Amino acid sequence: KIEIKAKKIAHSLIELLDVEGLLAVEFLLDKNDNLFVNEVAPRPHNSGHHTIEANLTSQFEQHLRAILNLPPGNTKIKSPAVMFNLLGEENFAGPAVYEGFKEALELDRVYIHIYGKKETFPYRKMGHITVLSDTIEDATQKAIKLKKLVRVKSKQ
């Protein structure tokens, strides 16, 4: 029911805005199952970055196909995935220092993406990590452990 309502709202926005390419529509859901549009982005969006590894065609390729008037690619999921943002730690600001990468990269099917921002500050999006696994439950558990392990702090 909620998914159908979200799709209807998103389709209405697409038609209203006459978008060519991707249109990411981010919703918030309250405890009464009311949907609220939180963000509309006419571009690839952070919430779809997992498609880089998890889908046959990523959101980036889909966007290019759309604006170049090419047929859309297959969106089939290759693997269950969990993605989370790497955010600057609270109480840290300055040149970014990443902790826990070595340990994270020792794990199979873990993909770290750093956005190249030299300076961090609390809650700044500095990158993301995507975890693939055979089940969503296993990917979720691995992501929870990684979120505690990988940190973005600063030299100062």
Q: Language-model features: where?
A:
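Active-site "cap" helix and flanking loop/linker of ATP-utilizing ligase/carboxylase catalytic domains
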Residues: I4-V25, K31, A41-A93
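Phosphate-binding glycine-rich loops and adjacent basic patches that engage nucleotide phosphates
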Residues: V19-D30, G100-V110
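Short acidic-glycine loop/turn motifs at beta-strand connectors
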Residues: D30-D33, S133-T135
